[in-house]
């Protein structure tokens, strides 16, 4: 958990707190059943005065009627006026791993992630369940689980681990009393959704270690990347934190031994497997457009993007056909990768810290402990 404080500081820096995303989009798989209008689901657009000077455009006009969003309230700030020159040195191409066209600036918006915390929103029921059912069905639906190939098992473990992490985030910051706007921990949810299913805990650790592994393998690229936002002091801090993370002894020792599953990405079937998994992530990314909760959609897209970036790195570095090629990551991919790593780190830490209480609840739990559907 030595890495967690570094990640917490890193994602608060100007470079890593803004994520480019398409929030308003049509569901390509089933008729749109409407947006979630709970106040905790929304992401609101805030006046220019809430953002640092380098992130403003003089041509942008705001009326006196602009909504003011305050930190600590459910709504969060959206910056639609970020100057692309702030992030010089980064390529701007459509990401083949995601469904949305990230070069379509008219449809994209910049979101301040620090003012849009991932937590309980009230989004649940059949609509939310349909999302996860669709995501899981992207994994080898034509085969029963016992016949899954190794790469499909890896994909399932990654999605299950991400699902577990999101459940932990909701349980760790839950709306206990809406009338008093009281937030706290829902330990029963943590126990029911994650702890009493050992495979879900294992998959959480698996995805955490895989993303860590990807970060270490991209260390040379990430160290040399430009984290320029126009704020010299903050940019130096960002570069320092990135180096602290990349060359931390705990990180290097934790990721020294490669995953056995990485071997499936090598050999003559590597290119076909890459294309297959890339298409799966495009489909999963498209499913995120069907999420009825705007804030949930934001974090779903970010974390799917981050996981796709981790796999992109591992495919590239472990591939035998990339000797003369240079790893290229988009700015948005790097932001998603580090924010995903931070969210996974937060989940692992919370599960670890709550372990004694969970074990106590387990001893007093008389219900079956076998697998149950999500």
Give the role of each language-model region.
Residues 372-374:
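Short, solvent-exposed mixed-charge patches
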Residues 4, 9-14, 23-27:
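Secreted, propeptide-processed cysteine-rich mini-domains
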């Amino acid at each position: 958990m030595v890495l967690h404080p570094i990640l917490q500081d890193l994602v608060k820096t100007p470079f890593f707190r803004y994520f480019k995303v398409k929030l308003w989009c049509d569901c390509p798989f089933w008729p749109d059943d409407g947006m979630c209008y709970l106040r905790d689901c929304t992401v609101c657009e805030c006046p220019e005065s809430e953002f640092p000077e380098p992130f403003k455009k003089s041509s942008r006009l705001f009326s006196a009627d602009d909504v003011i969003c305050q930190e600590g309230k459910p709504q969060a700030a959206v910056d639609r006026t970020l100057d692309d020159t702030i992030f010089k040195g980064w390529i701007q191409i459509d990401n083949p791993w995601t469904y949305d066209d990230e070069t379509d600036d008219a449809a994209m918006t910049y979101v301040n992630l620090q003012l849009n915390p991932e937590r309980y929103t009230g989004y649940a029921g059949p609509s939310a369940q349909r999302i996860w059912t669709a995501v899981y069905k992207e994994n080898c639906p034509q085969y029963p689980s016992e016949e899954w190939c190794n790469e499909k098992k890896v994909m399932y473990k990654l999605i299950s681990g991400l699902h577990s992490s999101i459940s932990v985030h909701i349980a760790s910051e839950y709306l206990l009393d809406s009338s008093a706007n009281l937030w706290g921990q829902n330990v029963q949810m943590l126990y029911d959704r994650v702890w009493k299913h050992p495979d879900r805990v294992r998959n959480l650790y698996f995805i955490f270690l895989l993303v860590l592994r990807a970060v270490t393998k991209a260390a040379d690229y990430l160290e040399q990347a430009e984290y320029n936002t126009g704020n010299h002091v903050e940019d130096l801090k960002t570069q320092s934190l990135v180096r602290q993370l990349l060359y931390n002894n705990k990180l290097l020792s934790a990721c020294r031994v490669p995953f056995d599953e990485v071997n499936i990405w090598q050999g003559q079937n590597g290119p076909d497997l890459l294309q297959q998994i890339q298409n799966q992530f495009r489909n999963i990314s498209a499913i995120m457009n069907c999420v009825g909760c705007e804030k949930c959609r934001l974090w779903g897209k970010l974390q799917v993007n981050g996981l796709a970036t981790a796999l992109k790195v591992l495919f590239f570095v472990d591939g035998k056909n990339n000797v003369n090629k240079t790893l290229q990551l988009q700015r948005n991919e790097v932001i998603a990768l580090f924010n995903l790593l931070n969210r996974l780190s937060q989940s692992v830490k919370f599960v670890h810290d709550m372990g004694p209480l969970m074990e106590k609840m387990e001893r007093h739990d008389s219900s079956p402990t076998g697998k149950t559907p999500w």
